């Protein structure tokens, strides 16, 4: 999903989760959501001291890779001008694993320039308002309407 390190990223994450809960073509209960699968349920947004804990970091990293490998779709919530390096790595990894990569951009930011590499791995880029009705049973390719940098 998204980074959740800034207010804008956190709002986008919450909006995406709300839209996914409303989408009848996705089984969110059995989907891998990184923030809901932190090692030992330790959330570093609540306990930043664990960012220095190698065990937590390695287990969380490996858990996210397992989540990508065992999922059909990689959905990345992308906030232009606030790119999350971790999301970029996960997008590339998902593509290398043959996963369908869907980027979701908040409506008010849709059309802004996005990173060329994130654009390149995406099979489709949609507005947040389209996520609740996106048909995950019929994924399609489409171009992003905005520019790249």
Curated annotation (Swiss-Prot):
Catalytic activities: 2-deoxy-D-ribosyl-base(1) + base(2) = 2-deoxy-D-ribosyl-base(2) + base(1)
InterPro entries per UniProt: Nucleoside_deoxyribTrfase (IPR007710)
Record keyword Transferase present: yes
Domain of life: Bacteria
UniProt key word Transferase: yes
SUPFAM superfamilies according to UniProt: N-(deoxy)ribosyltransferase-like
Pathway(s) the chain acts in: Nucleotide metabolism; nucleotide salvage pathway
GO molecular function, a single term: nucleoside deoxyribosyltransferase activity
Gene3D superfamilies documented for this protein: 3.40.50.450
Catalytic-site annotation from UniProt: 90 (nucleophile)
Catalytic activity, EC: 2.4.2.6
Keywords: Nucleotide metabolism, Transferase
GO BP: nucleotide salvage
Function as written in the Swiss-Prot or TrEMBL entry: Catalyzes the cleavage of the glycosidic bond of 2'-deoxyribonucleosides and the transfer of the deoxyribosyl moiety to an acceptor purine or pyrimidine base.
Family statement: Belongs to the nucleoside deoxyribosyltransferase family.
Protein name in UniProt: Nucleoside deoxyribosyltransferase
Species per Swiss-Prot/TrEMBL record: Lactobacillus johnsonii (strain CNCM I-12250 / La1 / NCC 533)
Lineage: Bacteria, Bacillati, Bacillota, Bacilli, Lactobacillales
Gene: ntd
